[in-house]
Amino acid sequence: MPARPRILFVAEAVTLAHLARPAALAACLDPARYDARIACADAARRFLGAGAAQAEPLRSIAAASFAQRLAAGQPVYTLAELRDYVTDDLALFDRVQPELVVGDFRLSLSVSARLAGVPYLAISNAYWSPWAADRSLPLPVLPWTRWVPLALAQRGFDLVRPLVLAPHCRPLQRLRRAHGLPPLPADLRQVYTDADRVLYADDAALFPLGDDAPPQHRHLGPVPWSPPLPLPPWWTELPAGQDLAYVTMGSSGPAQALPLLVAALRGLGLGVVVATAGAPLPAPGAGVWAADYLPGELAAARARIVVCNGGAPTAQQALAAGAPVLGVCSNMDQFLHMRGLAAHGLGRALRADRLGAPAIAAAAAALLAAPRPAPRPAPALRERFTPHVDALLAARAAPARTATPPLAPAATAR
């Protein structure tokens, strides 16, 4: 093994979250000990910052295509796309020569890392684990769900769920079979978390695993990240004495809901700070400040309430600052995350297909009236992540690899 083992982080930049976590993890490694590289689509590089790990080019499907398929309830990848991904992955490995690959939603690594004989560590969320304590799946927003009573729609979804989710598993299963790899269990959660080791970027107290979880599946804890972009000129003009709401739908939320959200929050007397992620927003009126992107940790720290799509990245920024979360959820990932927060009194979820000003105002007012949550800052990332890297590197350096390498100390999970 070289003096500085090369760790390749592979970011599937279909949403900003799947770039953010690899970028934060690559940045946390000691550069004197590790040669960290990050592979991502060219369009995502602007979010890495000047001091980031060396970037390597890698194709991803268009974020818009991913979002459209997700909203329609279709498989997010075709077999042909995953086949091309494997070709690109193997060319990347040949060029970079990594000792360890760390992936975030790059499903093709289930095949390509095994073909290359490179240890593969996957970053995911605990509510997607096959061994999550709560393994039920909520009904996402689909083209037909707004027209059906919700309780009836959920019961129907529960009955047909295996049939509905099977097509989402099929492309990767066929790809594995084509390369002589054994099939995975017929479970979307298995498809999302197949790796030599899986680390869950969640607070273990909020999203526990069951007692039957295997040793290679463990919590890492939250992975904080904000885009390394300058603050807008108006940032210093925010009124110190006014309660603020921080609103962002991110890269995977219903951007069309922004005007409705802003109006409802202004109706509660809140100032509103908005990160639009590039979505159009009517000219802000008094008490509204907008930018394409903001450092979410700073915005959440200024906010009395955070309104987002319910996904982990922004919600974790809110929790770290002690701000309650109002999640406007569309896809299953967002509903799963907000279910965990709501169960602990840290937030409320609204469905994007049943969104209206009265519901927004009522949910926000209830969160504002409740006691403010205690801040939940994430422990130092380097100390949590490095032991897992070292364990996998040590296993690869051993003459024979016969078992899953030992885990990092349990203290690495929050």
Label every PLM stretch briefly.
Residues 189-232, 389-414:
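C-terminal intrinsically disordered extensions
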Residues 106, 203-204, 250, 311:
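Flexible loop residues that form catalytic
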Residues 26-27, 46, 205-305:
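Donor-nucleotide binding loops and adjacent catalytic segments primarily
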Residues 2-114, 118-133, 137-150, 275-298, ...:
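Glycosyltransferase specificity loop/lid
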